[in-house]
Amino acid sequence: MRWRIIQVQYCFLLVPCMLTALEAVPIDVDKTKVHNTEPVENARIEPPDTGLYYDEYLKQVIEVLETDPHFREKLQKADIEEIRSGRLSQELDLVSHKVRTRLDELKRQEVGRLRMLIKAKLDALQDTGMNHHLLLKQFEHLNHQNPNTFESRDLDMLIKAATADLEQYDRTRHEEFKKYEMMKEHERREYLKTLSEEKRKEEESKFEEMKRKHEDHPKVNHPGSKDQLKEVWEETDGLDPNDFDPKTFFKLHDVNNDGFLDEQELEALFTRELEKVYNPQNAEDDMIEMEEERLRMREHVMSEIDNNKDRLVTLEEFLRATEKKEFLEPDSWETLDQQQLFTEDELKEYESIIAIQENELKKRAEELQKQKEDLQRQHDHLEAQKQEYHQAVQHLEQKKLQQGIAPSGPAGELKFEPHT
């Protein structure tokens, strides 16, 4: 659809952070101790350490973004205010698919790193013998008051921060998805306003037809139910459905063999269900909606299985869930196309916010244009004064020459012509 605005929302909050690295003061080098001063072609200049626990992640994001020529050009031309305000992040819509894919991968890796911290806390309580200090060494710089040792207080502080970040990450994704859907509808309606009555009816008819095509899909099993897991067992794992065994299933899908099903491993179980509804080759299927559906499925299963709310599923929790009635006889699962994602009042409120923002931008643009015109007038006035001054000086010099007086220099000193 021409009004579709594809956004990678979770990346929007990252680009403003580049300000820290961009504004950093370069390190002075004692050139007396540098033996080879010849320039090295294509030498790589490492950005300074920001001191943030996501420093490495930040550097990797910047490196990936700078591989995109369009974004690199925008970054070079952007001023500090554009970076701070987040306006530069809107350019993410225009980066290549390859760059977006790499950014997605970096984001997943960073979220996984935070999850490792939570697993370390659980392992510490169970005393499994894991080297926690080695695992958490990368996070020790967070505690500026105690940089030498890692105490229990440091671990608790990081656990709370990681948990809060992950929870906020999910909430933000839901909020941004809702805004995305409202923006799509807003753009669609605005586009219809530009059409004739006949063309508008054609577009409305196409829109309804695409909705019907999207809603026409096989039944989606309830996430985490026996039917859903057995389908994965049979179709993905290639095993006999009559031999389905929850314990074996758990071990098969504990990909990293750490004794837990983390959020990523859980989300992988829903791929077949999502493929029933979404196909990237179909214009009527929105892949951003698919990821929202995946998130909803994961949150739902976690709410039913993850008893201690540590965002990890143990084998014990998993087996206990398979003994519940809901595992065998679950309620039907409602996909996004069966739900009202926003009300008409919410859309109107969102559109009013957009209108306010557009008016503010328009006013700002008018102010900047006025400032530009004022500066141009001042420049023209100064140029005119400068021209008048030069003309007056030339006139005075000519008059002095006519009177036989030696011309003077800029400071009033006399200038004598050499005799020939």
Swiss-Prot record:
Residues that coordinate or bind Ca(2+) 2: 306, 308, 310, 317
GO biological process: intracellular calcium ion homeostasis; small GTPase-mediated signal transduction
Signal sequence region: 1-24
Sites of Phosphoserine modification: 332
Topology in the lipid bilayer: Peripheral membrane protein
Alphabetical list of Pfam families matching this protein: EF-hand_7 (PF13499), NUCB1_N (PF25434)
A GO molecular-function descriptor: DNA binding
One GO CC term on file: nuclear outer membrane
Binding site for Ca(2+) 1: 254, 256, 258, 265
Annotated region described as Binds to necdin, given as residue ranges: 213-420
Tissues with expression: Found in liver, heart, thymus, muscle, intestine, kidney, lung, spleen and throughout the brain, in cerebral cortex, hippocampus, hypothalamus and medulla oblongata. Nucb2 and necdin levels were higher in postmitotic neurons.
Keyword Phosphoprotein: yes
PROSITE patterns: EF_HAND_1 (PS00018), EF_HAND_2 (PS50222)
InterPro entries assigned: EF-hand-dom_pair, EF_Hand_1_Ca_BS, EF_hand_dom, Nucleobindin
Gene3D superfamilies linked: EF-hand (1.10.238.10)
Localization (cell): Cytoplasm; Perikaryon; Endoplasmic reticulum; Golgi apparatus
Organism superkingdom: Eukaryota
Keyword line: Calcium, Cleavage on pair of basic residues, Cytoplasm, DNA-binding, Endoplasmic reticulum, Golgi apparatus, Guanine-nucleotide releasing factor, Membrane, Metal-binding, Nucleus, Phosphoprotein, Repeat, Secreted, Signal
Sequence motif GBA, residues: 304-334
Disordered: annotated span: 193-225, 365-420
PANTHER family: NUCLEOBINDIN (PTHR19237), NUCLEOBINDIN-2 (PTHR19237:SF22)
Subunit structure: Interacts (via GBA motif) with guanine nucleotide-binding protein G(i) alpha subunit GNAI3. Preferentially interacts with inactive rather than active GNAI3. Interaction with GNAI3 is inhibited when NUCB2 binds calcium, probably due to a conformational change which renders the GBA motif inaccessible. Binds to the postmitotic growth suppressor NDN; coexpression abolishes NUCB2 secretion. Interacts with MC4R.
UniProt comment concerning the protein's domains: The GBA (G-alpha binding and activating) motif mediates binding to the alpha subunits of guanine nucleotide-binding proteins (G proteins).
Sequence similarity: Belongs to the nucleobindin family.
Protein name as it appears in the record: Nucleobindin-2
